[in-house]
Swiss-Prot record:
GO cellular component: cytoplasm; cytosol; nucleus; proteasome complex
Record PTM Phosphoserine, positions in chain: S113
Protein location: Cytoplasm; Nucleus
Its job: Active thioredoxin with a redox potential of about -250 mV.
GO molecular function terms listed in the Swiss-Prot or TrEMBL record: disulfide oxidoreductase activity; protein-disulfide reductase activity
Protein name: Thioredoxin-like protein 1
Domain PITH: 115-285
Alphabetical list of PROSITE patterns matching this protein: PITH, THIOREDOXIN_1
Tissue specificity statement from the Swiss-Prot or TrEMBL entry: Ubiquitous.
Gene it is expressed from: TXNL1
Keywords noted in UniProt: Cytoplasm, Disulfide bond, Electron transport, Nucleus, Phosphoprotein, Proteasome, Redox-active center, Transport
Transmembrane helix as UniProt keyword: no
Complexes and interactors: Component of the 19S regulatory cap of the 26S proteasome. Interacts with PSMD14/RPN11. Interacts with, and reduces EEF1A1.
Keyword Cytoplasm belongs to the record: yes
């Protein structure tokens, strides 16, 4: 939907989020008479037309007091970001440039822009929950680094000295993992034998990865690493995951180096919201914000 859609009452809020599906939903919490809210309104409206792949909603904290309380709104304007009805981020204040940067950040490599029909109902692409600053990759080449495999484009991650890679992926809140996508080329350089570890207390090296018992070991086929491939995980073992360490031991064709075109995880957040990011301070009617 192009344009900002006002949410008229509390019962309307969840249906609007449901309608957004896996697309990014940007919700502006505003209040009548709030100067900063009025100042950023034209820019917010402009962004809704500039980024039609996202859904833009506006909630008045007095008209929808229950929604404001549930989402712990303590000041206006506050912008909350949702995907699959799950809150994934927030932005506070009337800085239009900062808000647009946040929107672009979430739309970059947007898993919601192309609906993944192979993702089971009730699960979602967890790319928005990956904390890129907390990720690490050992034995990546200088020319083809780790960031490349987090994007759906022609770039790729390639190993450097040999065929092995050791990747640590951090999440910004605990998640449950159902499966993963692990895409590679069909020239023999795609990954084959892979060990998956979760929630390691510290980084491991290649020697430790070789000798340690994984949470799950994978033997990927050429079909698994195609674009439409899904690699199932043992769901009961991946119920409260803060980080994943992926040890790629070998590739499909015993090639000198390994390439990964793209990977992501499918699952759900443990909680619908990351409450550590928010203080429960709800303004009363008539208070200044």
């Amino acid at each position: 939907m192009v344009g900002v859609k006002p949410v008229g009452s509390d019962p309307d809020f969840q249906p609007e989020l449901s309608g957004a599906g896996s697309r990014l939903a940007v919700v502006k919490f505003t209040m009548r008479g709030c100067g900063p809210c009025l100042r950023i309104a034209p820019a917010f409206s402009s962004m809704s037309n500039k980024y039609p792949q996202a859904v833009f909603l506006e909630v008045d904290v007095h008209q929808c007091q229950g929604t404001a309380a549930t989402n712990n709104i303590s000041a206006t304007p506050t912008f909350l970001f949702f995907r699959n009805k799950v809150r994934i981020d927030q932005y506070q204040g009337a800085d239009a440039v900062g808000l647009e940067e946040k929107i672009k950040q979430h739309l970059e490599n947007d898993p919601g822009s192309n609906e993944d029909t192979d993702i089971p109902k009730g699960y979602m692409d967890l790319m928005p929950f990956i904390n890129k600053a907390g990720c690490e990759c050992l034995n990546e080449s200088d020319e083809h680094g780790f960031d490349n495999c987090l994007r759906k484009d022609t770039t790729f991650l390639e190993s450097d000295c040999d065929e092995q890679l050791l990747i640590t992926v951090a999440f910004n809140q605990p998640v449950k993992l159902y499966s993963m996508k692990f895409q590679g080329p069909d020239n023999g350089q795609g990954p084959k034998y892979v060990k998956i570890f979760i929630n390691l207390p510290r980084s491991m090296d290649f020697e430790e990865a070789e000798r340690s018992e994984p949470t799950q070991a994978l033997e990927l086929t050429e079909d698994d690493i195609k674009e439409d491939g899904i690699v199932p995980l043992r769901y009961v073992k991946f119920q409260n995951v803060n980080s994943v360490t992926i040890f790629v031991q070998s590739n499909q064709g015993e090639e000198e180096t390994t390439r990964i075109s793209y990977f992501t995880f499918i699952g759900t957040p443990v909680q619908a919201t990351n409450m550590n990011d928010f203080k429960r301070v709800v303004g009363k009617k008539g208070e200044s914000h």
